[in-house]
């Protein structure tokens, strides 16, 4: 399968376009990029990988509206989402991890606890409802996000291999 790493990579790859510049401003403030911007970028990624036998989306969709729009895009290709994998991690652990990542990566949006907390609030408000959206379709798989990278990776691979 082709791995599409969601809106963040899509935006960073197209930050020279008007949509990319606009989207990056939202990301730098820890906010979600508007759906119409993200959907357009993801649609372009799908088209440029149209011979793939499948897709793995990392960090996308982030809202139920995006999930519905993604379903519509995939319907045109006569494919559908097989599963949603959600990693369970407490907020305080996320803050700790992202601050550490900010030190090593230099990413400005990972160097401020206030921006990180804002991203977590945005997640709880806009992204967390995706669990119900995909659970209602029997596609939700929750995995414990605490543990070794190897263990977590094995758990994710087990879900993917079971599809």
List PLM regions with ranges:
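Single conserved hydrophobic/aromatic residue that forms the stacking wall/gate
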Residues: 1-6, 10-11
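Structural signal for short hydrophobic segments within the conserved structured cores
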Residues: 26, 31, 83, 141-143
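A glycine- and Lys/Arg-enriched "phosphate-lid" helix/loop adjacent to the NTP-binding pocket
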Residues: 25-26, 74-126
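P-loop NTPase switch/communication element
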Residues: 13-25
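NTP-dependent small-molecule kinase module
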Residues: 117, 121-163
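Residue-level signature of catalytic and energy-coupling elements of molecular machines
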Residues: 6, 42, 56, 85, ...
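Conserved nucleotide-binding/hydrolysis micro-motifs of P-loop NTPases
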Residues: 7-8, 61-65, 89-95, 103, ...
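Glycine-rich phosphate-binding loop used to anchor ATP phosphates in small-molecule kinases
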Residues: 29-74
């Amino acid at each position: 399968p082709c791995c599409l790493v969601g809106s963040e990579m899509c935006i960073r790859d197209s930050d020279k376009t008007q949509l990319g510049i606009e989207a990056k401003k939202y990301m730098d403030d820890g906010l979600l990029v508007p759906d119409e911007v993200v959907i357009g970028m993801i649609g372009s990624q799908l088209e440029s990988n149209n011979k793939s036998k499948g897709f793995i989306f990392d960090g996308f969709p982030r809202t139920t509206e995006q999930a519905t729009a993604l379903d519509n895009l995939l319907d045109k290709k006569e494919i559908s989402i097989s599963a949603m994998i959600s990693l369970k991690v407490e907020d305080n652990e996320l803050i700790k991890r992202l601050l550490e990542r900010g030190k090593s990566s230099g990413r400005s949006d990972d160097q401020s606890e206030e921006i990180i907390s804002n991203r977590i609030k945005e997640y709880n408000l806009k992204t967390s409802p995706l669990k119900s959206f995909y659970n209602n379709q029997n596609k939700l798989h929750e995995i414990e996000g605490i543990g070794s990278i190897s263990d977590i990776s094995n758990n994710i691979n087990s879900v993917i291999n079971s599809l």
